[in-house]
Amino acid sequence: MNKSNKKREGGLPTAVVLAAASFALNFGLIPQAIAATIGGTVIEDTIEDTPESTIESTPKTSPKKATKISPQSAQLTIAFNIPSQPLESGLVAFSQQADINIIGVTAILREHRVAVLKGDLTKAEALDRLLQGTGLSYEMINDTAVSIFVKAPVPEAPDEVPLLQEIIITATGRATDLQKTPIAVSAFDQTRLDFAGATDLRALSYMVPGLEMTNTAPQAATLVQLRGVGSTNITEIADGPVSIHVDGIYSPRSQAAVTLLYDVDRIEVLRGPQGTLRGRNSSSGSINIYNQQPLLDVVEGNLSVGYGNYDRREYRGALNLPVSDTFGLRFAGATLRHDAYTDLLDNYQGLGPDYPATSDELTAFDQALDYGQSAPEMADKYSWRLSSLWQPTEQFSAFTSLERYRDQGAGLAQLAPDLVAKGIRAVVSDSPSFLDLTNTVLRTKLDYRATDFTLSYLYGKSQMDRQQIVDADNGRSSSFEQQRTHSSNFKFSSHELQLMNDDTERLRWLLGGFFSREKNEIVFAVDQQNAGGERNADGATSWISDFEGAAVSYAIQPDRRVESMGLFSQLTYDLDRFSRFTVGARYTNDSKSDRGGRAINCRVTSVLGSYVGPDSIGPGAPSPEDIYADAATQQAINAGSFHDNGTSEGIGDQPCWIRQVNDLKITWENVSGLLRYDYRPSDDLMYFATVSTGFKSGHIQDAGNHVAPETVTNFEVGFKAQYLDDRLRLNGALFHANYNDLQFSNEDRLDINFDGIADTGGSTVVRNASAATIQGLELELDWVMTDVDQMQLTAAFTHAHFDQFEIPDTLFGDLFNPYVSNQSVSPEDPVVLSGNSPPRVPDWKLTLSYSHNFIFDRGVLTPRVVLKASDSYYLDIYNRDTLAPGIFDSLPNGGSDLGVQKSYQLLDLSLSYKPAAKNWMVGAYIHNAANKDIKVDSGNALSSAGLVATYMEPRTYQLKFSYLFDEN
């Protein structure tokens, strides 16, 4: 039995133990009873969060000085019996039972509730309890009258240290303060994103604890991972465990969701299972992007221009136009272009001992030298968005946005680590990388707000088209190979209906229903070069086929569908003034189908596997259009039989054949739930405890195979606190997640010579790990140290491993080289991965930033330093680290860190200047200032310094100018 379960030695750093101890100490402050007894009177209260804006129209000054009250009246106790009810009617009951008149504000009384008030109390004691936490105060005018008024704000000292700003989010489906929301959530507005120099979602990887986001070469997709769990399958029907929503609309494909960040209102990243409200495929978390909506009362806009190295050019802007008092428009757009981070070479000769000039194994075919802008890692993308807001009445509003995104970059490249270590960021490519992706999205939200409830409808529709070429062998193989998305089309639509009651009710409920449909079609091809390496007349690479678009292997998926239906509800009940209980549940019905999907091979090799010269097969393999050229061919494809459509001489009578028939339809059902208790002993401190379950849809794949859904049960406790007079914010969460049928992908085995022995690696397949356990601690700190100094810290300490995970040996008895051929391995001899760590899960990772404002008469100069540090992590499920000498001829001395990224530190620097009383700002930004080489994903080709890998961007810098304007 093969084993690959090596683990790094040592436990978590001391910082983890100290942080956990601090966490437990804080949590121990919770009293065992949440009732206050005063003179034998038990007061059970409920707390309500009321935004300050709701009381602006009320008086903010106290009435005339009160008349003296008789001592007898002041000490007189009254037997009060006031049930829980709105504050307005509660004060009426108080007035009747105390025989006293109430004078003052009434506008906001309905927005608060009183809890049960029983027992013998003085009038003052009763009023203290009734008005606690409402922002209201009172003054006794005389024995028979009392005045209720809004507390006057305390004037701020001119030189007082600034306070942390309140952050309003909608993580619970309602607008709440971040610090009063019992969820592990991080939130950022556009100002914070600009301050960090963020241009796309990947920047959040160092701003959110436990979040990893990186691009990958195939499929132009982004790998999103939260709390140690992500998706390595990026095909046309794959699902990830981190859902992405834009303006409340679910985005099923990461290629369509991870676009440019511009004109953003806020981003909320929710950690842990969020399936109750966020729906399918949010078993480890949810990322929610909310763009700016039109304003109805002001003409305003912004513009920014940035220039940097690698000929970086970045433009962003937005314009808000109120057409009338009830209708407004907003237009925003962004572009980003830069040259390639990676150089293209003719061949690897002369670059070192691993690449000798005489090596047939590592010498590539000659290639066309003029690639223009098609070199790896260049960027050419733009996006625009037109949105409207119609608000004819105070009760109804309609928000609509139309967005288009296009990416014409060149994709990524997998680089040889030994070359990167020498400062050579270069690759040999037999085919220039190519990408053309467009995504068009329509989003609509309708809201109707009645007196006691709000009804919302959300509709989304999108279409994504993509063509792409990826060099599969990086020029390292004499059997040139490229992966080509000949065509693809992804159509998605969704409907969601939500009904919720008023925010001021003691029992707050939310009901909803969701339905979505996705239809995808794709033609994916694998091309190979002529065995002799001939070129066409124009110098371009010569293919086996003379037909444009022809290939040696196709995955033709004309109709892959996903349908999802969900019903959900969430209830929150205020137990008393200090604590509340939340329960939620969601029913999900997911259906996936493949109609007419076929994997087709066209013979370009002999039965023994040697390559056939181009002259022996005539015109060569057919193009996808040729394959479907006539009814007989279509009938053969549908039947899954061998066929010859007459476009090739072939070898024998069968130039092309169907390798796999993919027809399948399967449905999964799930009920996921949420139980949460939160306790707030003061306005500055909250604790919460949560038990939640999550569900990630099952997966269908080629040959009619499928894997089970992924489920998780998560246990979590957390706290949110503000100290130092609201100048220091500290939030933390401790979690333990048990996963069943955790989904991971690896390469399948193929039998290409029909001898019954699997002899080469093949397409990526998804498999279920029986079980996995992930636990960790997350901390976020935001500290206004002085009036000119500010610091932020995010930290994640994670321990993750597979409890039970065995897979077929797709590596042919060798854990370090997936492409070793001609070795027979029994299916009963699996690779045991139990105890291994999932990819890209460091034991700890933190980001520390510090900024200082130098204040001058003419403006403010702000330097900022950001330190990012991470422990080491593996890049694949095999946890491949050290290779002993003598195993492979190509690596006689062995190797180390084959599939590992060592621990590292990164440094980002910025300097910005904002003039006083002006609407412009200029800033300089440097990312990865020390130019560190950081692996984010791995491939399969082997070098002495490790497997080929995708790397983080090198050092980049830019100068950026921003301007804000409005009609005032």
Model-found features: residue ranges?
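Short, acidic, small-residue-rich periplasmic hinge/interaction motif at the N-terminus
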Residues: G39-I69, L91-A93, F149-D194
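N-terminal periplasmic accessory domains that precede
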Residues: S147-I148, L201, L223-Q225, H245, ...
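Membrane-embedded beta-barrel scaffold of Gram-negative outer-membrane proteins
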Residues: E166-I167, K445-V470, D678-G694, A708-A796, ...
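Short acidic/polar hinge/loop motifs at secondary-structure boundaries
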Residues: I234-T235, V242, D247-P273
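Transmembrane beta-barrel wall of Gram-negative outer-membrane proteins
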Residues: E300, Y307-A410, T438-T444, K491, ...
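Structural signature of Gram-negative outer-membrane beta-barrels, strongest in the C-terminal barrel
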Residues: L389-E394, L499-D502, F514-S516, P558-A737
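Gram-negative outer-membrane beta-barrel transporters
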Residues: M500, L510, R577, F581, ...
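C-terminal beta-signal and adjacent terminal beta-strands/loops
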Residues: N738-N740, S745, K868-P885, S912-N968
